[in-house]
């Protein structure tokens, strides 16, 4: 593969091992409202990279009782539950090693379906925030993954044409998003052994 013009990394499940923490936060919020069994682990991983509000919209389509709640408030509750768990986050060394290898040689960014402040906190706690020139969070875009907008915005902010970008990603929605943006994708699940929730 020729040297890319830029590298864009997903955050959760790619750079940092946060997926089990997100799963726990989802269940803390859902269990508190009596929805213990509506979000099994396989469905959770299928939504990797999708903003929390979009996940709740999907869950509400399939569980009528959830529609009685303010989904924006539930989104906030989930994010607060996750934020309380962030101090225990660790990095995924195989992928962080790749970021360190390219640091200072190629512009790099993080493109996440999570809130930017939470993404920054995860990167700060793991000591890798300074590797990245740009961080895109869910609040920066109108359409999250699998729409191409998040990765296109990352490329734009780095000043690199999308077709010259390579994306490191672990989730199906991220793969779809990156391919739709015209970018090459590295499936990091082949490199790492993720902790199951």
Which residue stretches match the model-derived regions?
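Active-site neighborhood of HAD-like aspartate-dependent phosphohydrolases
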Residues: 1-42, 180-181, 195
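Short, acidic loop-to-helix structural element flanking the phosphoryl-transfer center
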Residues: 83-110, 116
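A metal-dependent, Asp-based hydrolase signature
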Residues: 48-84
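Helix N-cap/coil-helix junction residues
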Residues: 35-37, 65-66, 128, 159-160
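Asp-based, Mg2+/Mn2+-dependent phosphohydrolase catalytic module
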Residues: 1-5, 96-97, 115-197
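N-terminal polybasic phosphate/anion-binding patch
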Residues: 28-57, 61-62
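Short beta->alpha linker loops
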Residues: 21, 50-51, 77, 90-94, ...
């Amino acid at each position: 593969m020729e040297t890319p013009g830029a590298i864009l990394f997903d955050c959760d499940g790619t750079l940092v091992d946060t997926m089990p923490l997100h799963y726990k936060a989802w269940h803390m919020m859902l269990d508190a409202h009596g929805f213990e069994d509506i979000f099994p682990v396989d469905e959770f991983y299928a939504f990797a990279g999708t903003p929390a509000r979009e996940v709740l919209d999907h869950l509400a389509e399939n569980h009528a009782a959830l529609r009685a709640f303010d989904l924006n408030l539930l989104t906030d509750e989930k994010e607060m539950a996750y934020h309380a768990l962030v101090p225990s986050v660790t990095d995924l060394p195989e992928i962080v090693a790749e970021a360190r290898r390219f640091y200072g040689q190629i512009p790099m960014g993080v493109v996440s379906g999570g809130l930017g402040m939470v993404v920054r906190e995860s990167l700060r706690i793991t000591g890798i925030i300074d590797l990245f020139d740009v961080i895109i969070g869910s609040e920066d875009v109108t359409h999250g993954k699998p729409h191409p907008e998040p990765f296109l915005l990352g490329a734009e902010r780095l000043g690199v044409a999308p077709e010259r970008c390579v994306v490191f990603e672990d989730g199906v929605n991220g793969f779809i998003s990156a391919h739709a943006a015209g970018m090459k994708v590295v499936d990091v699940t082949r490199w790492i052994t993720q902790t199951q929730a």
